[in-house]
Curated annotation (Swiss-Prot):
InterPro entries: Flavodoxin_fold, Flavoprotein-like_sf, FMN-dep_NADH:Q_OxRdtase_AzoR1, NADH:quinone_OxRdtase_FMN_depd. Its EC number is 1.6.5.-, 1.7.1.17. Its cofactor is FMN. FMN binds at M92, W93, N94, L95, S136, R137, G138, G139. Binds 1 FMN per subunit. Keywords: Flavoprotein, FMN, NAD, Oxidoreductase. GO terms for molecular function: electron transfer activity; FMN binding; oxidoreductase activity, acting on NAD(P)H as acceptor; oxidoreductase activity, acting on NAD(P)H, quinone or similar compound as acceptor. The gene is azoR. This is FMN-dependent NADH:quinone oxidoreductase.
Length: 198
Protein backbone atom coordinates (compact mmCIF):
# COMPACT_ATOMS: atom_id res chain seq x y z
CA UNK A 1 0.00 0.00 0.00
CA UNK A 2 1.32 3.43 -0.98
CA UNK A 3 0.80 6.68 0.85
CA UNK A 4 -0.10 9.54 -1.51
CA UNK A 5 0.14 13.21 -0.55
CA UNK A 6 -2.24 15.39 -2.57
CA UNK A 7 -0.99 18.97 -2.18
CA UNK A 8 -3.42 21.67 -3.31
CA UNK A 9 -2.37 25.31 -3.71
CA UNK A 10 -5.15 27.52 -5.03
CA UNK A 11 -7.29 30.07 -3.21
CA UNK A 12 -10.22 29.55 -5.60
CA UNK A 13 -13.23 27.54 -4.55
CA UNK A 14 -13.29 23.89 -5.60
CA UNK A 15 -15.68 24.30 -8.53
CA UNK A 16 -13.94 27.41 -9.87
CA UNK A 17 -10.37 26.12 -10.09
CA UNK A 18 -9.44 24.76 -13.50
CA UNK A 19 -6.37 23.18 -11.97
CA UNK A 20 -8.45 21.29 -9.41
CA UNK A 21 -10.89 20.06 -12.05
CA UNK A 22 -7.96 18.23 -13.60
CA UNK A 23 -6.20 17.20 -10.38
CA UNK A 24 -9.41 15.93 -8.74
CA UNK A 25 -10.06 13.81 -11.85
CA UNK A 26 -6.54 12.42 -11.52
CA UNK A 27 -7.14 11.52 -7.87
CA UNK A 28 -10.50 9.87 -8.57
CA UNK A 29 -9.01 7.71 -11.32
CA UNK A 30 -6.03 6.86 -9.13
CA UNK A 31 -8.38 5.71 -6.35
CA UNK A 32 -10.21 3.42 -8.78
CA UNK A 33 -6.95 1.77 -9.78
CA UNK A 34 -5.36 1.72 -6.31
CA UNK A 35 -8.21 1.26 -3.80
CA UNK A 36 -5.88 0.15 -1.00
CA UNK A 37 -3.65 3.22 -1.16
CA UNK A 38 -4.00 6.00 1.39
CA UNK A 39 -4.54 9.49 -0.04
CA UNK A 40 -3.91 12.44 2.27
CA UNK A 41 -5.26 15.75 0.97
CA UNK A 42 -3.37 18.84 2.08
CA UNK A 43 -5.12 22.07 1.07
CA UNK A 44 -2.40 24.60 1.85
CA UNK A 45 -4.81 27.52 2.20
CA UNK A 46 -6.60 25.61 4.96
CA UNK A 47 -3.39 24.82 6.83
CA UNK A 48 -1.57 27.02 9.34
CA UNK A 49 1.28 27.80 6.94
CA UNK A 50 3.02 31.17 6.93
CA UNK A 51 6.34 32.58 5.81
CA UNK A 52 9.19 31.49 8.06
CA UNK A 53 10.12 33.83 10.88
CA UNK A 54 13.30 34.10 12.93
CA UNK A 55 12.04 31.88 15.76
CA UNK A 56 11.02 29.20 13.24
CA UNK A 57 14.64 28.67 12.20
CA UNK A 58 15.49 27.14 15.56
CA UNK A 59 12.80 24.53 14.93
CA UNK A 60 14.11 23.76 11.45
CA UNK A 61 17.70 23.36 12.61
CA UNK A 62 16.90 21.83 16.00
CA UNK A 63 16.99 18.14 16.95
CA UNK A 64 15.06 15.63 14.84
CA UNK A 65 13.59 13.30 17.45
CA UNK A 66 10.20 11.88 18.41
CA UNK A 67 9.18 15.10 20.11
CA UNK A 68 10.01 17.14 17.00
CA UNK A 69 7.45 15.16 14.96
CA UNK A 70 4.68 17.15 16.66
CA UNK A 71 6.35 20.48 15.99
CA UNK A 72 4.07 22.91 14.14
CA UNK A 73 6.65 23.37 11.36
CA UNK A 74 8.52 20.07 11.23
CA UNK A 75 5.33 17.99 11.14
CA UNK A 76 4.95 18.96 7.47
CA UNK A 77 8.47 17.80 6.64
CA UNK A 78 7.90 14.46 8.38
CA UNK A 79 4.57 14.03 6.60
CA UNK A 80 6.20 14.83 3.25
CA UNK A 81 9.05 12.37 3.85
CA UNK A 82 6.59 9.66 4.92
CA UNK A 83 4.70 9.74 1.60
CA UNK A 84 5.50 7.51 -1.37
CA UNK A 85 3.88 9.62 -4.08
CA UNK A 86 3.02 13.29 -4.51
CA UNK A 87 0.28 15.03 -6.48
CA UNK A 88 0.95 18.77 -6.57
CA UNK A 89 -1.88 20.89 -7.98
CA UNK A 90 -1.07 24.58 -8.40
CA UNK A 91 -1.86 27.09 -11.14
CA UNK A 92 0.75 29.36 -12.67
CA UNK A 93 0.72 32.72 -10.94
CA UNK A 94 3.10 35.42 -12.18
CA UNK A 95 5.34 32.91 -14.00
CA UNK A 96 5.60 30.62 -10.95
CA UNK A 97 2.97 29.31 -8.51
CA UNK A 98 1.07 30.67 -5.48
CA UNK A 99 3.42 31.91 -2.75
CA UNK A 100 1.87 29.55 -0.20
CA UNK A 101 3.38 26.60 -2.08
CA UNK A 102 6.85 28.15 -1.74
CA UNK A 103 6.17 28.73 1.97
CA UNK A 104 5.20 25.04 2.26
CA UNK A 105 8.37 23.98 0.45
CA UNK A 106 10.37 26.01 2.98
CA UNK A 107 8.62 23.98 5.71
CA UNK A 108 9.51 20.62 4.14
CA UNK A 109 13.03 21.44 2.97
CA UNK A 110 14.70 20.31 6.18
CA UNK A 111 18.16 18.81 6.57
CA UNK A 112 17.90 15.44 8.26
CA UNK A 113 14.37 14.80 7.00
CA UNK A 114 14.12 15.40 3.24
CA UNK A 115 17.84 15.76 2.50
CA UNK A 116 21.18 15.71 4.31
CA UNK A 117 24.54 17.41 4.02
CA UNK A 118 27.62 15.29 3.34
CA UNK A 119 31.28 16.04 2.64
CA UNK A 120 30.46 15.63 -1.06
CA UNK A 121 27.51 18.00 -0.89
CA UNK A 122 23.76 17.72 -0.19
CA UNK A 123 22.07 14.36 -0.79
CA UNK A 124 18.34 13.76 -1.15
CA UNK A 125 16.71 11.29 1.24
CA UNK A 126 13.50 10.66 -0.70
CA UNK A 127 14.68 8.19 -3.31
CA UNK A 128 12.41 5.82 -5.26
CA UNK A 129 9.39 8.10 -4.96
CA UNK A 130 7.37 9.77 -7.68
CA UNK A 131 5.48 13.00 -8.23
CA UNK A 132 3.08 14.63 -10.66
CA UNK A 133 2.65 18.38 -11.02
CA UNK A 134 -0.72 19.52 -12.38
CA UNK A 135 -0.76 23.14 -13.54
CA UNK A 136 -3.09 25.42 -15.48
CA UNK A 137 -1.74 28.52 -17.22
CA UNK A 138 -3.34 31.49 -18.92
CA UNK A 139 -0.82 31.55 -21.76
CA UNK A 140 1.50 29.21 -23.62
CA UNK A 141 4.71 28.48 -21.75
CA UNK A 142 6.05 25.22 -23.17
CA UNK A 143 9.86 25.49 -23.27
CA UNK A 144 9.58 29.18 -22.36
CA UNK A 145 12.25 30.88 -20.21
CA UNK A 146 9.36 32.61 -18.43
CA UNK A 147 8.08 29.31 -17.01
CA UNK A 148 9.61 29.04 -13.55
CA UNK A 149 7.07 27.07 -11.52
CA UNK A 150 7.39 23.58 -12.97
CA UNK A 151 11.12 24.06 -13.43
CA UNK A 152 11.56 24.98 -9.77
CA UNK A 153 9.42 22.07 -8.54
CA UNK A 154 11.42 19.61 -10.63
CA UNK A 155 14.64 21.05 -9.23
CA UNK A 156 13.63 21.03 -5.56
CA UNK A 157 12.03 17.58 -5.78
CA UNK A 158 15.19 16.31 -7.47
CA UNK A 159 17.19 17.88 -4.64
CA UNK A 160 15.11 15.76 -2.24
CA UNK A 161 15.92 12.66 -4.32
CA UNK A 162 12.63 12.46 -6.24
CA UNK A 163 13.53 11.92 -9.89
CA UNK A 164 10.36 10.35 -11.32
CA UNK A 165 8.33 13.48 -12.05
CA UNK A 166 5.51 14.02 -14.54
CA UNK A 167 3.77 17.26 -15.50
CA UNK A 168 0.22 17.72 -16.73
CA UNK A 169 -0.04 21.26 -18.05
CA UNK A 170 -3.17 22.95 -19.36
CA UNK A 171 -2.00 26.04 -21.25
CA UNK A 172 -3.53 29.02 -23.08
CA UNK A 173 -6.66 29.11 -20.93
CA UNK A 174 -6.91 32.90 -21.02
CA UNK A 175 -6.13 33.35 -24.72
CA UNK A 176 -8.99 35.01 -26.61
CA UNK A 177 -10.87 32.53 -28.77
CA UNK A 178 -9.67 29.42 -26.94
CA UNK A 179 -12.33 26.88 -26.02
CA UNK A 180 -11.58 26.65 -22.31
CA UNK A 181 -13.98 23.78 -21.62
CA UNK A 182 -12.32 21.74 -24.36
CA UNK A 183 -8.85 22.54 -23.02
CA UNK A 184 -9.83 21.49 -19.51
CA UNK A 185 -11.43 18.34 -20.91
CA UNK A 186 -8.16 17.51 -22.70
CA UNK A 187 -6.32 18.04 -19.41
CA UNK A 188 -8.71 15.70 -17.61
CA UNK A 189 -8.17 13.05 -20.28
CA UNK A 190 -4.40 13.35 -19.83
CA UNK A 191 -4.83 13.13 -16.07
CA UNK A 192 -6.98 10.00 -16.24
CA UNK A 193 -4.51 8.33 -18.58
CA UNK A 194 -1.52 9.09 -16.34
CA UNK A 195 -3.36 8.18 -13.13
CA UNK A 196 -3.82 4.61 -14.37
CA UNK A 197 -0.06 4.02 -14.30
CA UNK A 198 1.06 6.44 -11.57
Amino acid sequence: MSKVLYIKANIKNEGESRTFKVSDSFVEEYKKNNPEDQIITLDLYKENIDFLRADDLGKLFGPKDEESKNNSILKYAYQFADADKYIIAAPMWNLSFPAILKAYIDYVSVSGITFKYTAEGPVGLLNNKKAVHIVSRGGGYDNSPYEMGDRYLRTILGFFGIKDIETIDIDNLDVIGVNVKEKVKEGIEKAISLAKKF
